[in-house]
Protein backbone atom coordinates (compact mmCIF):
# COMPACT_ATOMS: atom_id res chain seq x y z
CA UNK A 1 0.00 0.00 0.00
CA UNK A 2 2.80 2.45 0.89
CA UNK A 3 4.49 1.88 -2.46
CA UNK A 4 1.24 2.56 -4.32
CA UNK A 5 0.60 5.74 -2.34
CA UNK A 6 4.16 6.90 -3.01
CA UNK A 7 3.77 6.61 -6.79
CA UNK A 8 0.26 8.06 -6.68
CA UNK A 9 1.65 11.08 -4.82
CA UNK A 10 4.46 11.51 -7.36
CA UNK A 11 2.18 11.11 -10.38
CA UNK A 12 -0.43 13.51 -9.00
CA UNK A 13 2.12 16.24 -8.33
CA UNK A 14 3.69 15.86 -11.78
CA UNK A 15 0.23 16.18 -13.35
CA UNK A 16 -0.46 19.27 -11.21
CA UNK A 17 2.81 20.85 -12.38
CA UNK A 18 1.98 20.10 -16.02
CA UNK A 19 -1.51 21.62 -15.66
CA UNK A 20 -0.18 24.76 -13.95
CA UNK A 21 2.46 25.16 -16.67
CA UNK A 22 -0.14 24.81 -19.42
CA UNK A 23 -2.52 27.19 -17.60
CA UNK A 24 0.13 29.91 -17.44
CA UNK A 25 1.06 29.43 -21.09
CA UNK A 26 -2.60 29.84 -22.05
CA UNK A 27 -3.26 32.78 -19.71
CA UNK A 28 -3.70 36.29 -21.08
CA UNK A 29 -1.97 37.80 -18.02
CA UNK A 30 0.94 36.68 -15.83
CA UNK A 31 -0.80 37.32 -12.49
CA UNK A 32 -0.69 33.64 -11.44
CA UNK A 33 2.86 33.01 -12.66
CA UNK A 34 4.72 33.91 -9.40
CA UNK A 35 2.53 31.71 -7.20
CA UNK A 36 2.64 28.93 -9.81
CA UNK A 37 6.45 29.01 -9.78
CA UNK A 38 6.52 28.77 -5.98
CA UNK A 39 4.00 25.93 -5.96
CA UNK A 40 5.86 24.13 -8.74
CA UNK A 41 9.11 24.35 -6.78
CA UNK A 42 7.43 22.99 -3.65
CA UNK A 43 5.84 20.09 -5.53
CA UNK A 44 9.07 19.20 -7.35
CA UNK A 45 10.98 19.26 -4.07
CA UNK A 46 8.32 17.08 -2.48
CA UNK A 47 8.59 14.59 -5.34
CA UNK A 48 12.40 14.56 -5.03
CA UNK A 49 12.32 13.93 -1.26
CA UNK A 50 9.79 11.16 -1.76
CA UNK A 51 11.84 9.50 -4.51
CA UNK A 52 14.96 9.68 -2.33
CA UNK A 53 12.90 8.41 0.63
CA UNK A 54 14.49 10.94 2.93
CA UNK A 55 14.03 10.39 6.65
CA UNK A 56 11.83 13.01 8.38
CA UNK A 57 14.69 15.09 9.76
CA UNK A 58 13.95 18.56 11.11
CA UNK A 59 14.67 20.39 7.78
CA UNK A 60 12.53 17.86 5.91
CA UNK A 61 9.67 18.30 8.41
CA UNK A 62 9.91 22.08 8.06
CA UNK A 63 9.62 21.72 4.29
CA UNK A 64 6.70 19.29 4.63
CA UNK A 65 4.96 21.88 6.83
CA UNK A 66 5.16 24.44 4.02
CA UNK A 67 4.09 21.76 1.55
CA UNK A 68 0.96 21.13 3.64
CA UNK A 69 0.29 24.88 3.61
CA UNK A 70 0.71 25.05 -0.17
CA UNK A 71 -1.26 21.94 -1.12
CA UNK A 72 -4.82 23.42 -1.07
CA UNK A 73 -3.56 26.43 -3.07
CA UNK A 74 -2.18 24.10 -5.74
CA UNK A 75 -5.40 22.11 -5.80
CA UNK A 76 -7.46 25.29 -6.04
CA UNK A 77 -5.52 26.66 -9.03
CA UNK A 78 -5.52 23.32 -10.86
CA UNK A 79 -9.21 22.65 -10.29
CA UNK A 80 -10.18 26.23 -11.13
CA UNK A 81 -8.42 25.98 -14.49
CA UNK A 82 -9.90 22.56 -15.29
CA UNK A 83 -13.36 23.62 -14.17
CA UNK A 84 -13.32 26.58 -16.57
CA UNK A 85 -11.91 24.67 -19.55
CA UNK A 86 -13.55 21.27 -19.39
CA UNK A 87 -16.65 20.91 -21.55
CA UNK A 88 -16.84 17.11 -21.53
CA UNK A 89 -19.54 15.90 -19.13
CA UNK A 90 -17.86 12.52 -18.42
CA UNK A 91 -14.53 14.21 -17.68
CA UNK A 92 -16.19 16.78 -15.40
CA UNK A 93 -17.84 13.96 -13.44
CA UNK A 94 -14.53 12.07 -13.31
CA UNK A 95 -12.82 15.16 -11.92
CA UNK A 96 -15.57 15.55 -9.31
CA UNK A 97 -15.10 11.95 -8.19
CA UNK A 98 -11.32 12.32 -8.12
CA UNK A 99 -11.65 15.36 -5.85
CA UNK A 100 -12.94 13.00 -3.17
CA UNK A 101 -9.61 11.20 -2.91
CA UNK A 102 -7.08 13.76 -4.12
CA UNK A 103 -5.80 14.44 -0.57
CA UNK A 104 -4.97 10.80 0.17
CA UNK A 105 -1.58 10.52 -1.59
CA UNK A 106 -0.50 13.90 -0.19
CA UNK A 107 -1.51 12.74 3.29
CA UNK A 108 0.77 9.74 2.81
CA UNK A 109 3.84 11.99 2.56
CA UNK A 110 2.68 14.55 5.12
CA UNK A 111 1.56 12.13 7.85
CA UNK A 112 4.47 13.05 10.19
CA UNK A 113 3.21 16.65 10.11
CA UNK A 114 -0.30 15.59 11.13
CA UNK A 115 0.97 13.75 14.21
CA UNK A 116 1.13 17.13 15.92
CA UNK A 117 -2.35 18.04 17.16
CA UNK A 118 -1.74 21.73 16.45
CA UNK A 119 -0.82 20.93 12.85
CA UNK A 120 -3.74 18.50 12.61
CA UNK A 121 -6.17 21.25 13.55
CA UNK A 122 -4.47 23.95 11.47
CA UNK A 123 -4.29 21.99 8.24
CA UNK A 124 -7.64 20.25 8.62
CA UNK A 125 -9.24 23.69 8.86
CA UNK A 126 -7.14 25.14 6.04
CA UNK A 127 -7.60 22.20 3.68
CA UNK A 128 -11.33 21.74 4.12
CA UNK A 129 -12.83 24.81 5.80
CA UNK A 130 -11.06 27.93 4.57
CA UNK A 131 -9.61 26.54 1.33
CA UNK A 132 -9.47 23.30 -0.55
CA UNK A 133 -12.25 21.16 -1.91
CA UNK A 134 -15.41 22.95 -0.65
CA UNK A 135 -14.48 26.14 -2.50
CA UNK A 136 -13.38 24.22 -5.59
CA UNK A 137 -16.39 22.01 -6.16
CA UNK A 138 -18.78 24.87 -7.15
CA UNK A 139 -16.47 25.72 -10.05
CA UNK A 140 -17.08 22.39 -11.74
CA UNK A 141 -19.43 22.61 -14.70
CA UNK A 142 -22.16 20.11 -13.85
CA UNK A 143 -24.83 20.20 -16.57
CA UNK A 144 -27.58 18.37 -14.69
CA UNK A 145 -29.80 20.70 -12.57
CA UNK A 146 -30.58 17.96 -10.06
CA UNK A 147 -26.87 17.31 -9.44
CA UNK A 148 -25.75 20.93 -9.39
CA UNK A 149 -26.71 21.62 -5.72
CA UNK A 150 -24.44 18.77 -4.65
CA UNK A 151 -21.51 20.93 -5.75
CA UNK A 152 -22.73 24.51 -5.32
CA UNK A 153 -23.74 23.79 -1.71
CA UNK A 154 -20.30 22.46 -0.79
CA UNK A 155 -21.70 19.01 -0.02
CA UNK A 156 -19.19 17.34 -2.33
CA UNK A 157 -16.42 18.99 -0.38
CA UNK A 158 -17.81 17.53 2.84
CA UNK A 159 -17.53 14.04 1.35
CA UNK A 160 -13.89 14.73 0.50
CA UNK A 161 -13.38 15.88 4.10
CA UNK A 162 -14.95 12.64 5.33
CA UNK A 163 -12.60 10.52 3.22
CA UNK A 164 -9.64 12.59 4.38
CA UNK A 165 -10.64 12.42 8.07
CA UNK A 166 -11.17 8.66 8.08
CA UNK A 167 -7.83 8.06 6.36
CA UNK A 168 -6.00 10.50 8.64
CA UNK A 169 -7.36 9.22 11.95
CA UNK A 170 -6.98 5.56 11.00
CA UNK A 171 -3.38 6.25 9.96
CA UNK A 172 -2.77 7.80 13.38
CA UNK A 173 -4.24 4.81 15.21
CA UNK A 174 -7.74 6.06 16.04
CA UNK A 175 -10.76 3.80 15.67
CA UNK A 176 -13.99 4.58 13.84
CA UNK A 177 -16.35 3.14 16.46
CA UNK A 178 -19.52 3.54 14.36
CA UNK A 179 -19.01 0.07 12.95
CA UNK A 180 -18.81 -1.61 16.37
CA UNK A 181 -21.63 -2.44 18.82
CA UNK A 182 -22.14 -0.22 21.85
CA UNK A 183 -23.40 -1.93 24.99
CA UNK A 184 -25.12 -0.84 28.21
CA UNK A 185 -26.88 2.17 26.71
CA UNK A 186 -30.01 3.17 28.61
CA UNK A 187 -33.22 2.90 26.58
CA UNK A 188 -34.65 5.73 28.68
CA UNK A 189 -31.67 7.98 27.95
CA UNK A 190 -31.77 7.19 24.23
CA UNK A 191 -35.51 7.93 24.17
CA UNK A 192 -34.92 11.24 25.93
CA UNK A 193 -32.17 12.15 23.45
CA UNK A 194 -34.49 11.29 20.54
CA UNK A 195 -37.41 13.31 21.92
CA UNK A 196 -35.15 16.23 22.73
CA UNK A 197 -33.74 16.13 19.19
CA UNK A 198 -37.23 16.39 17.68
CA UNK A 199 -38.43 19.13 20.03
CA UNK A 200 -35.23 21.17 19.83
CA UNK A 201 -35.21 21.00 16.02
CA UNK A 202 -38.78 22.32 15.86
CA UNK A 203 -38.17 24.92 18.58
CA UNK A 204 -35.02 26.23 16.90
CA UNK A 205 -36.67 26.62 13.49
CA UNK A 206 -40.32 27.48 14.16
CA UNK A 207 -40.71 28.93 17.66
CA UNK A 208 -42.69 32.21 17.89
CA UNK A 209 -40.64 34.59 20.02
CA UNK A 210 -43.61 36.44 21.56
CA UNK A 211 -43.68 35.69 25.27
CA UNK A 212 -42.20 33.16 27.68
CA UNK A 213 -45.06 30.64 27.31
CA UNK A 214 -45.83 30.87 23.58
CA UNK A 215 -42.14 30.59 22.74
CA UNK A 216 -42.11 27.11 24.25
CA UNK A 217 -45.26 25.68 22.70
CA UNK A 218 -46.41 27.74 19.69
CA UNK A 219 -44.71 27.00 16.35
CA UNK A 220 -45.20 28.77 13.02
CA UNK A 221 -44.59 26.56 9.97
CA UNK A 222 -45.78 29.07 7.36
CA UNK A 223 -42.25 30.07 6.28
CA UNK A 224 -41.02 26.52 5.82
CA UNK A 225 -39.84 26.43 2.19
CA UNK A 226 -37.16 23.77 1.61
CA UNK A 227 -35.07 23.77 -1.56
CA UNK A 228 -32.48 21.27 -2.86
CA UNK A 229 -29.72 23.84 -2.35
CA UNK A 230 -30.66 24.51 1.30
CA UNK A 231 -31.04 20.80 1.96
CA UNK A 232 -27.59 19.92 0.64
CA UNK A 233 -26.08 22.95 2.39
CA UNK A 234 -27.45 21.58 5.66
CA UNK A 235 -26.16 18.09 4.89
CA UNK A 236 -22.76 19.55 4.06
CA UNK A 237 -22.62 21.39 7.39
CA UNK A 238 -23.70 18.33 9.34
CA UNK A 239 -21.28 15.93 7.71
CA UNK A 240 -18.29 18.23 7.46
CA UNK A 241 -18.47 20.04 10.81
CA UNK A 242 -19.12 16.89 12.83
CA UNK A 243 -16.29 14.99 11.17
CA UNK A 244 -13.92 17.91 11.65
CA UNK A 245 -14.86 19.00 15.17
CA UNK A 246 -16.27 15.87 16.79
CA UNK A 247 -14.10 13.23 15.10
CA UNK A 248 -10.73 14.88 14.43
CA UNK A 249 -10.63 17.60 17.09
CA UNK A 250 -12.48 15.92 19.97
CA UNK A 251 -10.65 12.59 19.68
CA UNK A 252 -7.30 14.34 19.34
CA UNK A 253 -7.86 16.33 22.54
CA UNK A 254 -9.12 13.23 24.35
CA UNK A 255 -5.82 11.58 23.52
CA UNK A 256 -3.71 14.58 24.54
CA UNK A 257 -5.37 14.73 27.96
CA UNK A 258 -5.73 10.97 28.42
CA UNK A 259 -3.89 11.14 31.77
CA UNK A 260 -5.77 14.21 33.04
CA UNK A 261 -8.51 13.95 35.64
CA UNK A 262 -10.80 16.20 33.60
CA UNK A 263 -9.87 14.67 30.24
CA UNK A 264 -13.43 14.47 28.89
CA UNK A 265 -14.54 17.92 30.06
CA UNK A 266 -11.39 19.59 28.73
CA UNK A 267 -11.64 17.88 25.34
CA UNK A 268 -15.31 18.82 24.97
CA UNK A 269 -14.69 22.42 26.06
CA UNK A 270 -11.74 23.10 23.75
CA UNK A 271 -13.12 21.28 20.67
CA UNK A 272 -16.48 23.05 21.10
CA UNK A 273 -14.76 26.42 21.48
CA UNK A 274 -12.90 25.86 18.20
CA UNK A 275 -16.16 24.75 16.58
CA UNK A 276 -17.82 27.98 17.70
CA UNK A 277 -14.96 30.24 16.65
CA UNK A 278 -14.91 28.73 13.15
CA UNK A 279 -18.30 30.37 12.58
CA UNK A 280 -16.59 33.78 12.66
CA UNK A 281 -15.81 33.09 9.00
CA UNK A 282 -19.49 33.83 8.26
CA UNK A 283 -18.53 37.50 8.56
CA UNK A 284 -16.77 37.07 5.21
CA UNK A 285 -20.11 36.05 3.74
CA UNK A 286 -21.67 39.35 4.81
CA UNK A 287 -23.35 38.16 8.00
CA UNK A 288 -24.07 40.77 10.69
CA UNK A 289 -21.46 41.06 13.49
CA UNK A 290 -23.89 40.68 16.41
CA UNK A 291 -25.61 37.78 14.66
CA UNK A 292 -22.23 36.14 14.10
CA UNK A 293 -21.28 36.53 17.77
CA UNK A 294 -24.61 35.00 18.71
CA UNK A 295 -23.94 32.13 16.32
CA UNK A 296 -20.49 31.57 17.84
CA UNK A 297 -21.99 31.29 21.34
CA UNK A 298 -24.78 29.03 20.09
CA UNK A 299 -22.27 26.83 18.23
CA UNK A 300 -20.09 26.46 21.34
CA UNK A 301 -23.10 25.37 23.39
CA UNK A 302 -24.38 22.98 20.76
CA UNK A 303 -20.82 21.67 20.53
CA UNK A 304 -21.12 20.67 24.21
CA UNK A 305 -24.37 18.88 23.45
CA UNK A 306 -23.22 17.08 20.30
CA UNK A 307 -19.92 16.04 21.90
CA UNK A 308 -21.70 14.52 24.89
CA UNK A 309 -24.14 12.63 22.64
CA UNK A 310 -21.31 11.38 20.43
CA UNK A 311 -19.28 10.13 23.38
CA UNK A 312 -22.35 8.55 25.00
CA UNK A 313 -23.50 6.66 21.91
CA UNK A 314 -20.03 6.14 20.44
CA UNK A 315 -21.60 6.72 17.04
CA UNK A 316 -20.65 9.73 14.93
CA UNK A 317 -23.68 9.27 12.67
CA UNK A 318 -26.01 10.19 15.56
CA UNK A 319 -24.63 13.72 15.86
CA UNK A 320 -24.29 14.10 12.09
CA UNK A 321 -28.01 13.32 11.78
CA UNK A 322 -28.90 15.68 14.67
CA UNK A 323 -26.84 18.47 13.11
CA UNK A 324 -28.41 17.93 9.68
CA UNK A 325 -31.94 18.03 11.11
CA UNK A 326 -31.27 21.28 12.96
CA UNK A 327 -29.84 22.97 9.87
CA UNK A 328 -32.34 21.61 7.33
CA UNK A 329 -35.31 22.99 9.24
CA UNK A 330 -33.57 26.22 10.28
CA UNK A 331 -32.33 27.02 6.76
CA UNK A 332 -35.68 26.11 5.19
CA UNK A 333 -37.61 28.33 7.59
CA UNK A 334 -35.42 31.40 7.00
CA UNK A 335 -34.54 30.73 3.36
CA UNK A 336 -30.83 31.16 4.05
CA UNK A 337 -27.88 29.54 5.79
CA UNK A 338 -26.95 32.97 7.18
CA UNK A 339 -28.47 34.53 10.29
CA UNK A 340 -30.49 37.74 10.14
CA UNK A 341 -29.14 40.96 11.66
CA UNK A 342 -29.46 41.20 15.46
CA UNK A 343 -29.02 43.72 18.26
CA UNK A 344 -27.61 43.21 21.76
CA UNK A 345 -31.15 43.21 23.19
CA UNK A 346 -32.00 40.17 21.06
CA UNK A 347 -29.74 38.07 23.29
CA UNK A 348 -32.30 38.36 26.08
CA UNK A 349 -35.49 37.45 24.23
CA UNK A 350 -37.38 34.36 25.49
CA UNK A 351 -36.24 32.37 22.47
CA UNK A 352 -32.52 32.98 23.00
CA UNK A 353 -32.72 32.50 26.77
CA UNK A 354 -34.49 29.17 26.31
CA UNK A 355 -32.00 28.18 23.63
CA UNK A 356 -29.11 28.84 26.01
CA UNK A 357 -30.75 26.94 28.88
CA UNK A 358 -31.78 23.95 26.77
CA UNK A 359 -28.28 23.39 25.42
CA UNK A 360 -26.49 24.03 28.71
CA UNK A 361 -28.76 21.95 30.95
CA UNK A 362 -29.00 19.02 28.54
CA UNK A 363 -25.21 18.93 28.17
CA UNK A 364 -24.72 18.98 31.95
CA UNK A 365 -27.25 16.16 32.32
CA UNK A 366 -25.47 14.07 29.68
CA UNK A 367 -22.15 14.49 31.48
CA UNK A 368 -23.35 13.33 34.91
CA UNK A 369 -24.54 10.11 36.56
CA UNK A 370 -24.48 6.75 34.79
CA UNK A 371 -24.23 8.53 31.45
CA UNK A 372 -20.77 9.85 32.39
CA UNK A 373 -19.64 6.30 33.26
CA UNK A 374 -20.75 5.04 29.85
CA UNK A 375 -18.94 7.97 28.22
CA UNK A 376 -15.73 7.03 30.05
CA UNK A 377 -16.04 3.46 28.79
CA UNK A 378 -16.69 4.58 25.21
CA UNK A 379 -13.75 6.96 25.23
CA UNK A 380 -11.45 3.98 25.83
CA UNK A 381 -12.78 2.38 22.63
CA UNK A 382 -12.90 5.47 20.42
CA UNK A 383 -9.19 5.31 19.72
CA UNK A 384 -6.74 2.44 19.56
CA UNK A 385 -3.17 3.29 20.42
CA UNK A 386 -0.58 2.13 17.92
CA UNK A 387 3.09 1.71 18.67
CA UNK A 388 3.66 5.27 17.44
CA UNK A 389 2.26 8.07 19.55
CA UNK A 390 -0.38 9.96 17.50
CA UNK A 391 -0.10 13.07 19.62
Question: Where is each model-derived feature located?
Answer:
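Membrane-interface capping segments at transmembrane-helix boundaries
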Residues: 3, 51-59, 111-114, 171-176, ...
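Alpha-helical transmembrane segments
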Residues: 4-22, 39-45, 64-78, 101-102, ...
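Juxtamembrane helix-loop-helix connectors linking adjacent transmembrane helices
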Residues: 22-30, 82-89, 93-96, 104-125, ...
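Canonical alpha-helical transmembrane segments
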Residues: 43-62, 79, 103-111, 165-170, ...
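Membrane-interface helix/loop boundary segments of multi-pass membrane proteins
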Residues: 240-270, 311-315
Amino acid sequence: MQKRMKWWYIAQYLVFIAILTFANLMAETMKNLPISLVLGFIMLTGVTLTLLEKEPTKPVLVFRWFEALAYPVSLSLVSSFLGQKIESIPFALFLAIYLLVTALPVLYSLLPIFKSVINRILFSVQWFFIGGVPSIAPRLKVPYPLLRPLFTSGFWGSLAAAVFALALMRSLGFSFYDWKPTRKLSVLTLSFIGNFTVYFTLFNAFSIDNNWLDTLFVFDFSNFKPTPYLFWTAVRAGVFEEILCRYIFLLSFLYIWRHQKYQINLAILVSSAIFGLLHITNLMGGQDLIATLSQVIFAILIGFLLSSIYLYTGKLWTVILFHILIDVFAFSSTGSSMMEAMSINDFFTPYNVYLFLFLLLFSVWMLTGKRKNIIRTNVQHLFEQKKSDPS
